[in-house]
Amino acid sequence: MASLLRRRFYSSESSFAQRLRDLPKYLPGTNIKTQVSQLIGKTPLVYLNKVSEGCGAYIAVKQEMMQPTSSIKDRPAFAMINDAEKKGLITPGKTTLIEPTSGNMGISMAFMAAMKGYKMILTMPSYTSLERRVTMRAFGADLVTTDPTKGMGGTIKKAYDLLESTPNAYMLQQFSNPANTQAHFETTGPEIWEDTQGNVDIFVMGIGSGGTVSGVGQYLKSKNPNVKIYGIEPTESNVLNGGNPGPHEITGNGVGFKPDILDMDVMEEVLMVSSEESVNMARELALKEGLMVGISSGANTVAALRLANRPENKGKLIVTIHPSFGERYLSSVLYEDIRKEAQNMQPVSVD
C-alpha cells in the first residue's frame, strides 16, 4: 500500500511539473507587456496654461516623466544597448558597461543593464543629486564620483581610464553614438508629429549630448522643412555661443563642449537660459501647472515662453519637452528651502 501511494504521489508530482513546462510563456490575447522596456515611449503632450497666459503662441510639452525611469534617457539607453548587441559588441553576462553621466542617462543605463544582465559602472560629477546616486545603486550599478571642478570633462576622462583597466569593458559613448540621435529620429520625433497632426511649427530643446534636439529636429525637418528648431544651453556655460564652460545648475545640459552627435545645422539658434531662471520656472510649473519637473524642464519652458512672445510666432504651435520628474531633484537646489522646512517640522500633540 505504501509503495502504491508513493508511486501515485510521484506520478502526480511529475504530471504537475510537466503541465508547468507545457504552459506557454505568455498568455495569448492579452494586452500585457512581456518586458518593462516595452513601456518606453508614447509619452503624452500637454498644453501649458497658467504660465503661458498672455503669450501669443501655443506651447505643448512632451512629458517624459512618464517613462519607466521617469526620464527621456530611457529612449537612447535602450537604443544604444540594442544597437551594440546587434553589432556583436556586447554580450549580457560577459560585458561590463562603463559610461560617464550627469545622472539621468546613468539611471536609464543602469535600468537597462539590470533588465538585460550587464554589470554597469558609471562615472559622474560629485555634485549630482543624492536621488540619482541612490537610484543607480538600486539598479545595481557601481558609481565613481569625480571632482566637481573638472565638470563632465573630468567624468569622461575617468570613464576612459576605467575602460582601459577593466576586462571585457565597453563604453556606449552617448556623446558620439549615432544610435542616440537615431532613437529620437525614430521615436520622439514621429510621436510629436503624430500627436500634433503635423501642426508643430517650432521645437525647442536643451542640449546635453545633443541627441534629442538633433534627432527630433532632423525628423521634423524631413516632414516639413519650415519647422524651426532651437537649442538651449546654460548662460553660465555657453560654449555653443562662443563662451566658456562654467558651473551651472541645469543638470544634463551644458556639458562644456560640443558633442560629436550634435547637429548644429538643424538649429536656427541656440538660446541661453540661466540656472536661476530654470530653477524658478521648475518651481512655478509645480505650483501653477501641477507639473513637478526637473531643472532642465524649467529651462526648456523658459525658452519656449521667449519664443512664444516673439511677434513673428503669434498663433504658432511650439513644442518642447519636460525630460524628467521633479522628485529626482529633492536634494538639489530646486527644493532646498522646502527640504529644510520639511526636515525641521515638529510633531503636534494629539489629544
From Swiss-Prot:
Record Pfam families: PALP (PF00291)
Top-level taxon in the UniProt lineage: Eukaryota
Gene3D superfamilies for the chain: 3.40.50.1100
Presequence boundaries: 1-10
Residues in coiled coil: none
Localization per Swiss-Prot or TrEMBL: Mitochondrion
SUPFAM superfamilies in alphabetical order: Tryptophan synthase beta subunit-like PLP-dependent enzymes
Main location: mitochondrion
UniProt binding sites for pyridoxal 5'-phosphate: N104, G208, S209, G210, G211, T212, S296
Protein keywords: Amino-acid biosynthesis, Cysteine biosynthesis, Lyase, Mitochondrion, Pyridoxal phosphate, Transferase, Transit peptide
Protein name: Bifunctional L-3-cyanoalanine synthase/cysteine synthase 1, mitochondrial
Species this protein is from: Solanum tuberosum (Potato)
